[in-house]
Amino acid sequence: MKENFIAALGMTVSASAKQHQVVDNPPVDIILIGGGVMSATLGTYLKALEPGWTIHMYERLEKTAEESSNGWNNAGTGHAAFCELNYTTLSPAGSVDISKAVAVNESFEISRQFWAYLVKQKILTNPQSFINNVPHMSFVWGEDNIRFLRQRFDALQTSTLFRGMEYSENPQQIREWAPLVMDGRDTFQKVAATRMAMGTDVNFGEMTQQLLAALQQYPQFHLHLQHDVVDIKRNADQTWSVRVADHSNGGRQSTVCARHVFIGGGGASLTLLQKSGIPEVNGYAGFPVGGQFLVATNPEVVGHHHAKVYGKASVGAPPMSVPHIDTRILDGKQALLFGPFATFSSKFLKRGSWLDLFHSLTRQNLLPMLRVGLDNFGLMRYLIGQLLMSDKDRLNALREYYPQATMADWSLIEAGQRVQVIKKDAGKGGILQFGTEVVSSADGSLSVLLGASPGASTAAPIMLELLASMFKEQVTTDAWQRKLKEMVPSYGQTINGNLALTNEIRLSTSEVLGLTYIEAKPLPGEPADGKWEGLQKAM
């Protein structure tokens, strides 16, 4: 019996050894975790900057770009702050702060330049497959909201980035811009709208697939599908050991060593960062919020609307909850989406685990999470109200933006999961942070992107920021500086306030991407600024 026990133990140890294979090869240059637009963008940058580097990408699903990057899992708005009212806030003194809107727009201009470069390099093909002009509108009703929108419009005109925006309180003009929004509306209701004709709809799923298809042409790039990262550890030589489970091979585990690691796993990024054990993660937590959209594909409905119309968020609602009715171009076809309607799930990914939230709780982040819950009753009340909504309630919400809507034309779909960042705060104990944030190890060799909106629209500038933190020595070299300026001609420049630079960039990228160009003109009495030389040559 003793011999049988020893034999059985030996078989168990042997089986365990077979299940986990330690790869004793030289470290790869970088591991990208997650097959979405962020990892694809970083991989594309690095392949241009260091063609000889070895890059391994690990994606847990059968296909890439199936979570937040998928076109049906996000709003597809090219976030440029043209229509999103939450990027401009009203101060107690009554003035409108446009600093966030300017920053978001500058970031989107960087993305446009990067995409235009990739089209010229034939890395991205057929721009209309991933980006199309759809005018961006803000639409409000009620005296207070109209006053705010007028103030916002006036404030934005001080920025060269928002020249060409139109404002109207004339119902007939607004009907020409967005007939579905006005048809059937109470004629006595006072309304106002702004419109930016150069707004865009972006299919980030299609873009990601094209970027990865180009990367796979290089022998140094290796894409591993159905590979789940289960652990990340720091080695004595300051490299990283990344343990992965191959679910296409019975969960067989192996360990790969890397000099650098980027975690771009969407909602799952927080728990992956926690596995690394770096002290910088202490105090970070995540609050998952899901979303649903009403979708219409009836040509008679879809054909009468060509705009992304954003309203004003409810009091206490998170920025990502701003109601909007959008023209979307997905899989080559037009559709209308209205929402989002918030949902709650403890999953950090749409195809994640119900235990994600609970697995992310630690002694360091439990207090910040509890403080956020206590300090955000408005958000909690909003979420509860959303969860209790009936089909009739959703139809009534839709009719605020499309008065003649009938439920027969619409169906409800589940969008992607977003995980809002919660971080420790010395004063409040914990704060809920909207937007995205890069968190890195002290030496920058491991970095992660946390958060949500504006997200994919600003992938190019976010990855530029990450390049500077991960590759501190390389980014200052002449070779990298030249290449970065080739890929993003305004790199190192401030676009806002430079009328000539604004127009040069927009004209060049519009021509390459097949988009509408609107000249930014000086205000009355404002001198035209100097022309930035060399942009067209660089583009």
From Swiss-Prot:
Enzyme kind, highest EC tier: oxidoreductase
Keywords, in A-Z order: FAD, Flavoprotein, Oxidoreductase, Tricarboxylic acid cycle
EC number from the UniProt entry: 1.1.5.4
Record-linked Pfam families: Mqo (PF06039)
Reactions this protein catalyses: (S)-malate + a quinone = a quinol + oxaloacetate
Molecular function GO labels: 2-hydroxyglutarate dehydrogenase activity; L-malate dehydrogenase (quinone) activity
Cofactors that this protein relies on: FAD
Pathway where it operates: Carbohydrate metabolism; tricarboxylic acid cycle; oxaloacetate from (S)-malate (quinone route): step 1/1
GO process annotations (BP): tricarboxylic acid cycle
NCBIfam families with a match to the protein in the record: mal_quin_oxido (TIGR01320), PRK05257.1-1 (NF003603), PRK05257.1-4 (NF003605), PRK05257.2-1 (NF003606), PRK05257.3-2 (NF003611), PRK13339.1 (NF009875)
Family: Belongs to the MQO family.
HAMAP family: MQO
Name this protein carries in UniProt: Probable malate:quinone oxidoreductase
Gene transcribed to yield this protein: mqo
